[in-house]
Amino acid sequence: MSKTYIIGFPRIGEKRELKFALEAFWAGNASFEEVKTVAKTLRERHWKYQQEHHIDFISCNDFSLYDTMLDTIVMLGAIPPRFVGIEDKTERYFAMARGDAQRAAMEMTKWFNTNYHYIVPEIHAHMTFHVDISKIVDEYIEAKALGLNPKINLIGPLTFLALANPVDGSDIFSLFDSIL
């Protein structure tokens, strides 16, 4: 018997709830806790929708506050040097995406010629990866607590490297083993 799953679910919310929460946060009119509450509500709504429509394996780690590739960059600890000095993880995450007064944002480009844009990883030959899977684990536990059968979505290492920018011109695929 075949099983069903989807690769990912639109995350913005049918009334653009995530967009409005993020804009309020960036404008200083909402706390990050409020953004996280909106995000959790949306994840739960989207998971329940899939369950109600008889999807066998509910995707988790497909929700992002900004970009799934940016989440993968953070998960791998592939932080460009200009952002390393930002201690607050939330501030660093959004500075990488949007830039700040001292730093240019990371480049964005089209995801496989679609209208979706992703943050381009900046890779160099001597990069050391420091994996942090806490976001993935937290969302998996969150889905299991709702009685769901979640499957974890990941951008694979070859896709990550193939879509990266080798800032020093190095062979980025030489880093494949270090990601694993």
What is the meaning of each model-derived region?
Residues 1-180:
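Domain-level signal for soluble alpha/beta catalytic cores
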